[in-house]
Amino acid sequence: MAVFTAVSDSDLAQWMRHYELGDVLAFRGIPSGIENSNFFLTTTRGEYVLTIFEKLTAQQLPFYLDLMRHLAAHGVPVPDPIPRDDGALFGELHGKPAAIVTKLDGAAELAPGVEHCIEVGQMLARLHLAGRDYPRSQPNLRSLPWWQENVPAIVPFITDAQRTLLEGELAHQAGFFASDDYAALPAGPCHCDLFRDNVLFAHAAPGTGHDVRLGGFFDFYFAGCDKWLFDVAVTVNDWCVDLATGVLDVARADALLRAYQTVRPFTAEERRHWSDMLRAGAYRFWVSRLYDFYLPRAAEMLKPHDPGHFERILRERIAHTPALPEIQTACN
């Protein structure tokens, strides 16, 4: 969510003519992230987020925006795309597709506890089940084919030890993806990027018996149809780790995974390949962070993430992965 494309006051005024959102009160760029240009937008009607899509095309975008509308209609708290005056969910700004969505309440919890992981686990399972009847289909664009295409461009910049790990894990994942067990894993629309900074929490209402309340999931622009277990693995690799070492926090991981299973129990194939999928989740972000670090795009406000973080996580997952926790009952 960096700003690659600047938007002037006159640009914004022209753009807002296509919306019935009142007068603009405030507008500012969001500096975090590395994929799209995002801006907080406040009008007399409410708070919104304007996104200019730097890589996604007009042909790809309906999958993401319609998915958000679908999930919202099924009770999953996500940003709701705002239609333009012609009914479309996006238009063109500076020659690139752009959209406005509602801004969720709450703030990110960057030091989550067990209670936050429980909320995230339950809602992630609800998201997966809610997407079962979503009519559009688009693969996760940062999966195996993307890794195979981009790893060769990264290799010249890294050490021999890193190259051995990068190429060895790619071969391992290619074999896993080609297996019958992989084909049997449950799949559907996935967030694919459910990090701590893509989830908001608000204060729980008095008398509810809860300390935290999930405000919602956002930044769906890496979403795609993938194995649900991959989505769980990506989430656990961020929400349930020691940030300094990449080691799993067993208490948080256990809480998130048990909460997920109260909504959707894991299959036998998922249990067998939990280690493989945790490795896949770590590998995906190590590759993308290496690529963004060594082959960056120019941007006004760009803060590339440390690729070493997911290298440490990948090495940890190869060395140590506890089994998925068992539960006795499940409810819907």
UniProtKB/Swiss-Prot annotation:
It catalyses: L-homoserine + ATP = O-phospho-L-homoserine + ADP + H(+). Keywords: Amino-acid biosynthesis, ATP-binding, Kinase, Nucleotide-binding, Threonine biosynthesis, Transferase. One of its GO terms (biological process) is threonine biosynthetic process. This is Homoserine kinase. GO terms for molecular function: ATP binding; homoserine kinase activity. It comes from Burkholderia cenocepacia (strain ATCC BAA-245 / DSM 16553 / LMG 16656 / NCTC 13227 / J2315 / CF5610) (Burkholderia cepacia (strain J2315)). PANTHER family: AMINOGLYCOSIDE PHOSPHOTRANSFERASE DOMAIN-CONTAINING PROTEIN, AMINOGLYCOSIDE PHOSPHOTRANSFERASE DOMAIN-CONTAINING PROTEIN-RELATED. InterPro entries: Aminoglycoside_PTrfase, Homoserine_kinase_II, Kinase-like_dom_sf, Pseudomonas-type_ThrB. Its EC number is 2.7.1.39. HAMAP family: Homoser_kinase_2.
